[in-house]
Amino acid sequence: MMPRTIIEKIWDQHIVKHGEGKPDLLYIDLHLIHEVTSPQAFEGLRQKGRKVRRPQNTFATMDHNIPTVNRFEIKDEVAKRQVTALERNCEEFGVRLADLHSVDQGIVHVVGPELGLTLPGKTIVCGDSHTSTHGAFGALAFGIGTSEVEHVLSTQTLWQQRPKTLEVRVDGTLQKGVTAKDVILAVIGKYGVKFGTGYVIEYTGEVFRNMTMDERMTVCNMSIEAGARAGLIAPDEVTFEYCKNRKYTPKGEEFDKAVEEWKALRTDPGAVYDKSIVLDGNKISPMVTWGINPGMVLPVDSEVPAPESFSAEDDKKEAIRAYEYMGLTPHQKIEDIKVEHVFIGSCTNSRMTDLRQAADMIKGKKVADSVRAIVVPGSQSVKLQAEKEGLDQIFLEAGFEWRESGCSMCLSMNNDVVPEGERCASTSNRNFEGRQGKGARTHLVSPAMAAMAAIHGHFVDVRKFYQEKTVV
């Protein structure tokens, strides 16, 4: 057999029917659902008199539009109907549900891995674009639309066009203060928001190998912002150790057998990617987005670019539009940009590694008077673990708000929004116009960078923090 990439191996293992010159029919191992994109799909099943094909392969939670304060008091009528519909649909169709009373509740892309539902080699789908998060485990995971949600519910399969393969390799050693979020932002900043279109990315190199699973999930989460269908990292001992003893993982000899199978999930020597790019991890800095898409990003010690620095006319026009929306001027120093809000959370950066990084920055300090800062754990499990470690007290004593789990300020579908014209340092994944609220100005950063912005009221190079610690 010809050498294959891990992407090709997983794809080939899941083909139910090969489409000659057409999409392949893939078997789906895990279907994750939430309250926003599932109601219409269940209604479609009901109208056609169909059942959920594999309820045991389906898992639901509520996350997008639930409050993170007084979570049981949902005031928005649409949100309330969606949550109620999910409860009714899961009961009727026999689907497991982690509702607001469950210790398993949280953002769908956080709870899937921590419960052991997400495992190497699986095909995973969800009606949410950031399903690529699960690729951190060596799974092929991607978002789908509502009609596809219905198709998977009724057949446990999905027609998909075979993707091209793209290697993103980052070697070297990251500087102190440079995180997984900075790495993926640096990749997108260099190659743009469309370079991954039509591809599934495999992240390779020592920088990714040295990351925790939480950090790998951050990277794979933002594969979508690079335009890719999905992104993944081949499983290794770090992956296997994370998966061990999770609620839904195999146990004992079954787990050991699974690990032996998972070890084969790596790209063969001699396998050829359709495209490869390489970055030097030593040169990556803490990053801050300045514009209205994730590709408009620069090192924190940079200046907002001038229009003449863009060669393409469309890029110049987009930059001018960004200046106007973001309220910035060319040559303005990134570190001089003041913020009124700080959000630490989302499916990108709401796990224990993220909260520890942020807490490390603020211990013994106070949030600036001009800033409102909130921390939203990605799941009830993360919240409980953080409280066990005393992180909640560090945040509260510094002046942060400590919330219940949910998608929160990542998107303006719940009570947590940024007021019009105000600026937020956010650990989420999208800085589109209006993403955090009408007229809201979003700057994407790492948890460490967000925490420092909360303390100082403006962006600060977190590398200075580590330099000061070294001197002390």
Swiss-Prot record:
Catalytic activity: (2R,3S)-3-isopropylmalate = (2S)-2-isopropylmalate
GO biological process: L-leucine biosynthetic process
Name of a matching Pfam family: Aconitase
Enzyme class name: lyase
Cofactor(s) in the UniProt record: [4Fe-4S] cluster
Residue ranges crossing the lipid bilayer per the database entry: none
Keywords: 4Fe-4S, Amino-acid biosynthesis, Branched-chain amino acid biosynthesis, Iron, Iron-sulfur, Leucine biosynthesis, Lyase, Metal-binding
Key word Ribonucleoprotein present: no
Induction: By superoxide.
EC number: 4.2.1.33
Pathway membership: Amino-acid biosynthesis; L-leucine biosynthesis; L-leucine from 3-methyl-2-oxobutanoate: step 2/4
UniProt function note: Catalyzes the isomerization between 2-isopropylmalate and 3-isopropylmalate, via the formation of 2-isopropylmaleate.
Family: Belongs to the aconitase/IPM isomerase family. LeuC type 1 subfamily.
UniProt-recorded name of the protein: 3-isopropylmalate dehydratase large subunit
Taxonomic lineage: Bacteria, Bacillati, Bacillota, Bacilli, Bacillales
